[in-house]
Design a protein with these regions (language model features):
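Residues forming the flavin
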Residues: 1-177
Length: 177
């Protein structure tokens, strides 16, 4: 499921709306896997725990960022540092440098996700590092996957001469929840 579908539905439930059982996206009693390490993923962790998930695991394709200051992202750049939110403190397993390969299913329902441990090779020019395959593949058992992937950085294609962009189109998406 898309993370925002679950989060929006939960907000509506908290506001008093009801949904037919077959339309509910609920973590109750489930092994939840959240793909994406940002704020939306964090919201999914808290919501899943409050709904009574059996377990919650969050995976991220990028390497674990450092705690505290990061010399690779000095001010005024956005600080790439490890963020532990109140949702993380509610309980979850966090794993880093995992690329999702495929979803596994049984009887029309997800039962696992195949992932690969990846390595990130620094770019000497200071640009985005290069992702390298390690061949270390595993399956994470799950019966609810929430897609909370974001972006690494905004892309600025040039569509036409004298065409300019502003806001999220220029700087990338901001908080959505």
């Amino acid at each position: 499921h898309l993370a925002l579908d679950m989060l929006a539905q939960q907000n509506r439930i908290l506001a008093g709306m009801t949904f037919p059982k077959e339309q509910l996206v609920t973590a109750k009693g489930k092994k939840v896997l959240i793909i994406g390490g940002g704020d939306t993923g964090s919201d999914c962790i808290g919501t899943s725990n409050r709904q009574g998930a059996a377990s919650v695991t969050q995976i991220e394709i990028m390497p674990q960022p450092p705690v505290g200051q990061n010399p690779a992202t000095p001010w005024p750049q956005f600080p790439l540092v490890l963020k532990t939110t109140s949702s993380h403190e509610e309980g979850c397993s966090r794993r880093w440098s995992l690329a999702t390969h495929k979803f596994l299913g049984k009887n029309g329902k997800v039962c696992g996700v195949e992932v690969e441990q990846v390595e990130w090779i620094p770019n000497p020019d200071g640009d985005r590092p290069t992702m390298k395959s390690t061949g270390k593949i595993e399956v994470i058992e799950t019966d609810l996957v929430l897609l909370a992937m974001g972006f690494l950085k905004p892309e600025h294609p040039q569509f036409a001469k004298n065409v300019f962009v502003a806001g999220d189109a220029a700087s990338g998406a901001s908080l959505v929840v």
